[in-house]
Amino acid sequence: MEGKCLCSAITIRTLDKKSIDACHCGMCRRWGGGPALVVSCGSEVQIEGIDKLKVYKSSEWAQRAFCSECGTHIFYRLLSTNEYFVPVGLFQDDLEFEFKEQIFIDRKPSYYEFANQTLNMTEAEIFTKFASSENI
């Protein structure tokens, strides 16, 4: 799969991943003005246009990146696993995705709602999952 930022300065390539997750945490909502709708791309990601990529450490466990030219969000990356989460909007419109999971569901504001039936995880469930995966 291939995705691009608005100005095409950055191209991201990954293996075909066809599921979308939503994150309702406060950081993601602040970052994008609403929930983050992302494709979990694993660690096998190729990025062209690195010179235009602006990366910052947004928490003790993750980095966020955007295009320094147009501001498009490029990825959220977990530091412990090197797993990339890429906004679904970067990929071609003709790709078929399945909406699978919503995390931080207990942090979702009441002013929006998705109709899809998904797996839902609370903040506590997510932090428990991350804590157990770091102890492997």
Predicted regions located by residue number:
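A short Gly-Trp-Pro
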Residues: 1-4, 9-136
